Amino acid sequence: MKVNLMLKRGLATATATASSAPPKIKVGVLLSRIPIIKSELNELEKKYYEYQSELEKRLMWTFPAYFYFKKGTVAEHKFLSLQKGPISKKNGIWFPRGIPDIKHGRERSTKQEVKLSDDSTVAFSNNQKEQSKDDVNRPVIPNDRITEADRSNDMKSLERQLSRTLYLLVKDKSGTWKFPNFDLSDESKPLHVHAENELKLLSGDQIYTWSVSATPIGVLQDERNRTAEFIVKSHILAGKFDLVASKNDAFEDFAWLTKGEISEYVPKDYFNKTEFLLADN
């Protein structure tokens, strides 16, 4: 009876000792590429900016024709002949949009439209063709929002999804996608410094990152494996990420993904634990 009691006490002590052992510390990196261009406007935003633009044009100053065309010259006469003058106020006539409010030859309740002669338009078009790329007066032609990486569906390129936030994910040897994580080999260094050093060892010196804070933004606890992964938030500033085969034995592939794409790659429980850390845009 005494032996059985001592055996039970020994088993209870061993169980308590095993459960009180500290978990293994790991460092995860939430490396993001912030949006490069603005997101596309929805219908409400388009209507709002269109209204503000029209309102600004209506309230702007009247075009100073006297400054550009000397009074009594042929140039002034040619310019005035091209302009569509406003309808002046007349007695006995009903105006459904209100009585015209004309100042300096312009209806102030609407925007002013200035027309130029065909000669000026042709000359301007010819100058556009002759302008070189170094000319500061050349017309600004924006690049396409859809890049070549979007067309080819290149998940490893930083040039895709320019209006969205991209996050770096890696695939381990078991085929599971997740954020990069590393074992804490040197406890004398802060977590964010250790994460930056391990990330450079993983991808080489061709990547430049910036840690948002020395404080982790979250922790993933794995009760089964007795690990605690502290996640450090970081941004890529320049360069690119590419797995270096000679310095990597844990991961076999990587991708830059949006929040919606991450939900399709990682396990569901992993995404539920990290979803609140990801940006919607």
UniProtKB/Swiss-Prot annotation:
Query: Where is the region Disordered?
Result: 106-141
Sorted alphabetically, which keywords does the UniProt record give?
A: Mitochondrion, Ribonucleoprotein, Ribosomal protein, Transit peptide
Return the Basic and acidic residues bias intervals: 106-118
Gene Ontology CC annotation, any one:
mitochondrial large ribosomal subunit
The record's similarity note reads: Belongs to the mitochondrion-specific ribosomal protein mL46 family.
The record makes one more remark, namely: Present with 7400 molecules/cell in log phase SD medium.
Protein name per UniProt: Large ribosomal subunit protein mL46
Q: Which organism is it from?
A: Saccharomyces cerevisiae (strain ATCC 204508 / S288c)
